[in-house]
A protein has these predicted regions:
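Alpha/propeptide regions of enzymes that mature by internal proteolysis
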Residues: 19-188, 195, 217-250, 259, ...
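Register position in tetratricopeptide repeats
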Residues: 247, 281-282, 315
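Short coil turns that delineate tetratricopeptide repeat
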Residues: 266, 300-301
């Protein structure tokens, strides 16, 4: 692979390409992606797959209350932060993209899509992107791809986005990636994938920026792995709600949230453990004991954990009941 890239760089340099873009800094994220907005929730997202390592660290950009960006082909990462800044200043996706394209000497090699908080989408495919390369832009979305095996990838993505309109935005985006791969996908194969989702309103704190931020940097089946991670992420959303209920002293609500998480991710000992803790705190110790026993049989560390929960108040049963649990 390294030799192939060196040869390609030499060829591009000989044709004057290096004067148009910085060949040493431009990554080969030839790929397929979608930028989209949920018309009901206002959430915005980017989903991407490529036969390139860690595609999510290059292609996908987003800011709550502003918009999302996908920058690919011979990637100029500056389209991400610059595009978001322009849209935050009030420019539409189309105007922001047009301005940055006009300033880019390497635009012939770029493929970029912008989507703003109002659902306006705009995309650009440079004339020197590797075929098959195209884009389709519609209400609240844009799908784009380059270096595809066939010319059916992009139409399949657009069709899938419309088909799965009843799904939450994140799940809908994954279905679009699946459709792209089923239509042939990247001519080189599969390696990495990513998904980000941001909200419709500006946030105060950096850690609130992403509702979902998942990356599969190197995997034989990156889309399938991304789909699995999304399911796990959804389960942990219920775990987080359970934690908040514990903080609020609402043990019945915590038990409800932990139980839902466990149903979604039944192989997780941790989810079983916190459900059992919530049950014990809610006066259901006898019902919790069989769950604790199964957990301890699989991993003794959880037995040790029981004693550590007393001081911070995460386990509120009596001292004798703590001993009962630890003896299971």
């Amino acid at each position: 692979m390294k030799n192939i890239i060196k040869i390609l760089f030499l060829a591009l340099t000989a044709t004057g390409f290096s004067q148009q873009i910085d060949a040493d800094k431009s990554a080969f994220a030839h790929t397929f992606s979608i930028v989209a907005r949920d018309a009901e929730t206002g959430e915005m997202a980017v989903a991407v797959q490529s036969h390139w390592f860690s595609v999510g660290s290059l292609v996908s950009w987003g800011k709550s209350g502003v918009g999302v960006v996908a920058t690919q082909s011979f990637v100029n990462p500056s389209y991400g932060p610059k595009g978001l800044a322009l849209m935050q200043e009030g420019m539409s996706a189309e105007a922001a993209l047009e301005q940055l394209i006009a300033e880019d000497e390497g635009k012939a090699y770029r493929q970029v899509a912008f989507l703003d908080v109002n659902g306006n989408a705009s995309a650009y495919t440079g004339e020197k992107c590797v075929v098959y390369a195209s884009q389709i832009t519609g209400d609240n979305f844009s799908v784009q791809a380059n270096m595809m095996l066939t010319d059916q990838t992009v139409p399949a993505m657009a069709e899938a986005f419309e088909k799965y309109s009843e799904l939450p935005l994140a799940e809908r985006m994954v279905e679009v990636l699946k459709a792209a791969q089923a239509a042939g996908g990247d001519i080189r194969g599969k390696q990495s994938a990513a998904l980000i989702v941001v909200g419709p309103e500006l946030v105060e704190n950096p850690w609130e920026e992403y509702k979902i931020n998942l990356r599969v940097d190197d995997h034989q089946n990156p889309i399938e792995e991304l789909d699995r991670l999304l399911k796990v992420a959804r389960a942990y959303e219920y775990m987080n709600r359970g934690d908040l209920a514990v903080e609020a002293g609402d043990m019945p609500e915590a038990l409800k949230q932990y139980g839902t998480a466990e149903m979604m991710f039944p192989d997780s000992l941790e989810m079983k453990f916190w459900k059992a803790v919530a049950m014990a705190n809610d006066g259901q110790l006898e019902e919790a004991k069989p769950i604790f026993k199964v957990i301890f049989e699989q991993n003794e560390n959880w037995r040790e954990m029981i004693g550590r929960l007393v001081k911070p108040g995460l386990l509120t049963v009596s001292e004798s009941e703590v001993a009962e649990i630890q003896k299971l």
